[in-house]
A protein has these predicted regions:
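N-lobe entry segment of adenylate-forming
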Residues: 1-50, 54-69, 73, 142-149, ...
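Conserved AMP-binding/adenylation subdomain of ANL enzymes
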Residues: 216-233, 241-254
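Conserved AMP-binding A3 loop
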Residues: 49-53, 193-217
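Conserved AMP-binding
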Residues: 81-84, 105-107, 191, 228, ...
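Conserved AMP-binding/adenylate-forming core of the ANL superfamily
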Residues: 21, 38-92, 109-114, 165-174, ...
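ANL superfamily adenylate-forming
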Residues: 7, 131-189
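Conserved pre-ATP/AMP-binding loop-to-beta segment of ANL
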Residues: 37-38, 155, 160, 174-197, ...
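A short helix-loop-beta submotif of the ANL/AMP-binding
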Residues: 76, 82-102, 106-110, 118-125, ...
Length: 254
């Protein structure tokens, strides 16, 4: 992944003004888990419902897998997952391992997958084996040898079987213990947390690198301007790889 380029003078200004800080998205999530452990965090259209504490436990199992596969702070993990509860679990698992999150649009086919995962230097891919009658496992198999850094792939099998011998999301949750907090990957609020892809309307999609501080400040202001607090519920129909879906659907509620 290309080095994050932030104007040093501007960064110092953001810090002085209190816009940016060293707090991370994981810090925010864990604080919310402590405050509202039994409150629902995510509900999807398949009937899955998870509280903050449930996502905390499930994501810690994902983090254990990521660490076991050699993921280190700053490594990129890509996930091509619909608007499902698993998206939030995988995202929080990445944060606990210190990985950079890289959600990918469900519409990406071979050329876009190759480009996006090579540019981000993806180490591990999460996806659904099937979605809307399309074989996403076969699509990933067709590009794996053309993504230089990609070592492992994990598939959700809720809509169809995984045929290629890949690890499944279900297997991770059943076999890995939650990663202890003292083993979480250490990150800083000024470091890159997320890569979002542009639409690619004028050429190949580009990866927009966002720091923890970028996202925290953005969603603090979003909630403030709309008067949102812990008593509100966010309905998010937008794709979660989109800035609207990710920021307002995954981050704002925490």
């Amino acid at each position: 992944m290309d080095t994050m380029k932030v104007n040093q003078k501007q960064k110092e200004y953001y810090l002085e003004q209190g816009y940016w800080g060293h707090e991370t998205l994981l810090d925010r999530f864990l604080r919310t888990v402590e405050r509202f452990p039994d409150r629902e965090y995510v509900v999807d259209d398949r009937g899955n419902r998870h509280t903050y504490s449930q996502v905390d436990v499930l994501s810690s199992r994902i983090a254990s897998y990521l660490k076991d596969m050699g993921i280190k702070p700053g490594d990129c993990v890509s996930f091509q997952v619909p608007v499902w509860s698993e998206f939030a679990v995988i995202a929080m698992g990445c944060l606990k391992a210190g990985a950079v999150m890289h959600p990918i649009a469900m519409c990406y086919e071979e050329p876009d997958l190759i480009h996006a995962m090579n540019k981000s230097d993806t180490k591990i891919y999460f996806g659904t084996a099937w979605f809307r009658g399309k074989d996403y496992e076969a699509r990933l198999l067709a590009v794996m040898d053309r993504v230089a850094g990609l070592k492992h792939a994990v598939f959700l099998d809720s809509l169809g079987p995984v045929k290629g011998g890949f690890t499944t999301y279900r297997e991770i949750l059943e076999t890995y213990d939650p990663l202890p907090r003292e083993e979480y990957g250490l990150m800083d609020g000024l470091e890159v947390a997320l890569i979002l892809g542009t639409s690619g309307t004028t050429g190949s999609n580009k990866g927009v690198m966002l720091t923890h501080s970028n996202i925290i400040f953005s969603e603090e202001q979003f909630n403030l301007e709309l008067g949102l607090d812990e008593n509100d519920i966010m309905f998010m129909p937008a794709p979660l790889n989109h800035a609207t879906g990710f920021h307002h659907g995954i981050i704002a509620p925490m």
